[in-house]
């Protein structure tokens, strides 16, 4: 069974790994792991800038995403954008992101 929770700093290295894989798989880019680590840590250091979520199967994190708030004058409220979504290849098409 998949459980979704707010990510914690202890998930940082997994999130970094997933982001490095995402860039490689989707755009063929090799990211600087140190820079990605700083970027992920920045979200934990500045919670108003966004929030990471992880999906777990048992004790294993199998997916992550980042929600980023943005003010919408059209809606007179905050909307959330989904960024940096990654699901492990072996867990894709198994309703992890549903």
Which residues fall in each region the model found?
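Acetyl-CoA-dependent GNAT
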Residues: 2, 6-77, 83, 88
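Short amphipathic alpha-helical surface patches that serve as generic macromolecular interface elements
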Residues: 79, 97-98
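Conserved acetyl-CoA pyrophosphate-binding loop and the N-cap/start of the following alpha-helix
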Residues: 91-96
């Amino acid at each position: 069974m998949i459980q979704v929770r707010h990510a914690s700093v202890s998930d940082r290295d997994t999130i970094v790994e997933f982001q490095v894989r995402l860039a490689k798989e989707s755009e063929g880019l090799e990211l600087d792991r140190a820079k990605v680590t700083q970027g992920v840590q920045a979200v934990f250091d500045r919670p108003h800038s966004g929030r990471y979520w992880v999906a777990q199967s048992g004790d294993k994190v199998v997916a992550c995403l980042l929600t980023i708030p943005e003010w919408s004058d059209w809606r007179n409220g905050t909307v959330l954008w989904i960024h940096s979504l990654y699901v492990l290849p072996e867990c894709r098409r198994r309703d992890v992101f549903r």
